Curated annotation (Swiss-Prot):
Involved in the gluconeogenesis. Catalyzes stereospecifically the conversion of dihydroxyacetone phosphate (DHAP) to D-glyceraldehyde-3-phosphate (G3P). Pathway: Carbohydrate biosynthesis; gluconeogenesis; Carbohydrate degradation; glycolysis; D-glyceraldehyde 3-phosphate from glycerone phosphate: step 1/1. Pfam families: TIM. Belongs to the triosephosphate isomerase family. Its main location: cytoplasm. One of its GO terms (molecular function) is triose-phosphate isomerase activity. The active site is at H96 (electrophile), E168 (proton acceptor). It is an enzyme of class 5 (isomerase). It comes from Streptococcus agalactiae serotype V (strain ATCC BAA-611 / 2603 V/R). One of its GO terms (cellular component) is cytosol. It comes from the Bacteria. The gene is tpiA. This is Triosephosphate isomerase. Keywords: Cytoplasm, Gluconeogenesis, Glycolysis, Isomerase.
Length: 252
C-alpha cells in the first residue's frame, strides 16, 4: 500500500515568534508538491499562532507539541485540544520521550490525550522509543510494542488508520548517534506489526510510521528507502530553513 511520506520538524523549545515567522516565510513557497510528500512543523505553544498565520495558504502542516486530555478547566499551563483545533492546528505531537522523562507522562496519559485530540478533529503524532539500556538488553521490540498498544487502546480502526506513530530511540535523540537503516526498518516494522495484531493488517498498512533520532539531510534518504519507514520526526536539522528544505529533497 502506498503511504504518503511525512517529514515533520520538531522545534522543541526553540524560536521566538519573529524567528518562527521568518522560517515559515522562507520555506512555505519552496516545498515539494504535497502529492509527493507532506511537510510539517511542530511549533512551541508561544509561537503557534504566529506560525499558523504565516503558513496560511501554503501546504505546510502545523502541529502543536503537546495538549491535555481535557478541553478546559483548572489545568494551569496546559494546552486545550479544543482551542488548538479552533486555531487551525493540524496535528499534535504526544508521548515524546522528553515529555515522558521530564514531565512523567505515562502511557495512560498519552492514550487519554490521543482520544481528546481525535474528539476535536485533530490528528495525533504518537511518539514511542526505548532507552539505550533497553536496546542493549534486546528488549526494544517488547518495550516499544507495549507503548504502542497502550497508546492506541480504545481507539477505533478509522482513527488508528489516520494517525502517525513516530519511533524515536531515546539513545539517538540529540546525541549525534543514529539507528542503522536496518534498526530503523526493523523497529518501524515492529510498530506496524503491533498495530496489525491489535487492529488488523488493513489498518496497519495505512498507519504512517516515522523514524526520529539524529535525522539529517545527509541520511534521510537512507531511512526513507526502508519499506516501513514513512517519514521522519526531525529535531535539530529542522531549525534552519535550508536544512529543513534539504530534508525534503529525497523525493526528487
Amino acid at each position: 500500500m502506498s503511504r504518503k511520506p511525512f517529514i515533520a520538524g520538531n522545534w522543541k523549545m526553540n524560536k521566538n515568534p519573529e524567528e518562527a515567522k521568518a522560517f515559515i516565510e522562507a520555506v512555505a513557497s519552496k516545498l515539494p508538491s504535497s502529492e509527493l510528500v507532506e511537510a510539517g512543523i511542530a511549533a512551541p505553544a508561544l509561537t503557534l499562532s504566529t506560525v499558523l498565520e504565516a503558513a496560511k495558504g501554503s501546504e505546510l502542516k502545523i502541529a502543536a507539541q503537546n495538549s491535555y486530555f481535557e478541553n478546559s478547566g483548572a489545568f494551569t499551563g496546559e494546552n486545550s485540544p479544543k482551542v488548538l483545533a479552533e486555531m487551525g492546528t493540524d496535528y499534535v505531537v504526544i508521548g515524546h520521550s522528553e515529555r515522558r522523562d521530564y514531565f512523567h507522562e505515562t502511557d495512560q496519559d498519552i492514550n487519554k490525550k490521543a482520544k481528546a485530540i481525535f474528539a476535536n478533529g485533530l490528528t495525533p503524532i504518537i511518539c514511542c522509543g526505548e532507552s539505550l539500556e533497553t536496546y542493549e538488553a534486546g528488549k526494544a521490540v517488547e518495550f516499544v510494542g507495549a507503548q504502542v498498544s497502550a497508546a492506541l487502546a480504545g481507539l477505533s480502526e478509522e482513527q488508528v488508520s489516520s494517525l502517525v506513530i513516530a519511533y524515536e530511540p531515546i539513545w539517538a535523540i540529540g546525541t549525534g548517534k543514529s539507528a542503522t537503516q536496518d534498526d530503523a526498518q526493523n523497529m518501524c516494522k515492529a510498530v506496524r506489526d503491533v498495530v496489525a495484531a491489535d487492529f488488523g493488517q488493513a489498518v496497519a498498512d495505512k498507519v504512517r510510521v516515522q523514524y526520529g533520532g539524529s535525522v539529517k539531510p545527509e541520511n534521510v534518504a537512507e531511512y526513507m528507502a526502508c519499506p516501513d519507514v514513512d517519514g521522519a520526526l526531525v529535531g535539530g536539522a529542522s531549525l534552519e530553513a535550508e536544512s529543513f528544505l534539504a530534508l525534503l529533497d529525497f523525493v526528487k
